[in-house]
């Protein structure tokens, strides 16, 4: 069901758009104007399908999943939309005939700054799969004006600057002011009796903003389905107070405007201070309240009985950020729709499902009662009542067991615990990899699992092959299609048919030549952006992901320092040349993570400029890691660094993207690494380090002293001393003292070497040597790389979504008809 593409009509559409938008011809327009004109021409193709999809959903009155997420890391839209419309090559030809280069045009588009890490990219992959599989769904998030931040590296330091992605406009969004809703903050709750003697609650003396939706299309691959991502902007109720302005009170004149603007300014405002915490809670409630109001309004267009709302809608809560959904839905059902508590609870507990993404305590959000109750007074009353009823249940089920109440209560010790709220009120709780779900059930959420075993299930994460192979690695995609056909584009399990080619020497050479071409492409990117020459024949060893101590970028760079020491001591060391590639953003307030970035860059500066090692070791930190440069990186990688402390990474999806592009995993038995090794076999990955059970045992029982390793391992001692002797910072030898101290000394309640970097160091070094030995065997390496691709079928987000549909959402596929089909 591809698009019937008319080349001449498309060319005319581009030319007409330039004329209407800019009063220019193709020859006169600049690159950004060409991008806008081409995007609007592609949007024209989308519109018929988008309208047809929405009409079909309304006509068939379908059950719909609303995917609620603070982040949607969508990347660039133009190329993805053309791929999924199956017109990419047609449009490339049309533009060639106009004298325009599609690659240059695509590069004009900024990545949509609606997310940051794996959480947001997962949400984007899920939307892609839902549309491709034909399931009724839409995403709800926030239209951040500046995203998290744009990362610049200056003198080795991360500098955060606003990511002004909307400065030229977003051609793929449509503002929908007719679906705006008021969202209220603060004030107090007045209770009164209605004529039937029932308690009624009204929020008074509040401040409010208007949530205005912008719709973005989510195009399914080759099937006419176009779902929607709704991103909410905040506008003031009254834009400008002329009376205050005329009195000279200029701040008050624009106070309403600033209240609204602040909510949507940035993703994850720094919450190291009270104002930042308040802003985060405001953001969460803002998009949740608007999204529920929109869903209920849509429901009431075709249904009259609000008590059956859960038969048509299910909210999937992506991590704890949107879990206030539970209480806000209760509020709307009771205060605005007139249901009693039991009726509202029946609806709510059948339409809220929660995905847990972490066992890190810091990410299981808790809000101080004072803040929560002041900002959301009526919602807090409802949370209090949910907690009161649940604690009564606990007292009956576990009489006298105060420890259970402490762990499981929604409100305890002055805090509102959002994960507990989601579990108590949700009908489903899922982890995102087998190991992660096991840890939740046996450790972190053990008490809840014992009480509600039927709620818990696993849904191993996945990625969309359409972006990370078909679009990101066209050379490999074409090669695969030439071997097995193109069914893999919508059913990744077909990749297993490549296994018959892994021993074929001609196929091995073709495969490795494609890898080499992709390495040349990345080397060119690095030269243009970093000014560093890297050898495309070296091993490209890559770690790109959010910077966090548990992900252990520090272990990686300490090992690079160790390798450098070895090469300096023995210039004839028989190891292949290596290029270590990092890409990561650290949260603005996360000091040790930012210091780790500085360390990586200082080490790079020393190593890359040392002629004595003859270019056999290079270190590159790729600035402003994002979806669009990730596609280039994944395609070029030889080694995929997945080295989180075992038990800490819920799943990871970068590991899957590397695997799909033919990189070998070097990692711990953590997250989805466990399942990757199960699929590809232990011979085609290199695993090292403590197991999750061993890590948890050390954390619970103690028995690990990093100082012992420091005293007994000369290599480790040398590397750590280089952190504080000026080796990598002559002007300030103490620069990296905090990193040194974190590895060797307890600090308050924090244990030395919290993430077992020194404990795993020697095993990591040995694993590296083993990986390099594999690389020297060219045929063996080619076979392993090909097997990684052939065994990646399980890790499609299409498979993940089918499991969510089967076990949680219970949706039906919808077929959308459009008149211009082939």
Q: Whereabouts are the PLM-identified features?
A:
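A conserved ligand/cofactor-binding region detector
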Residues: 1-822
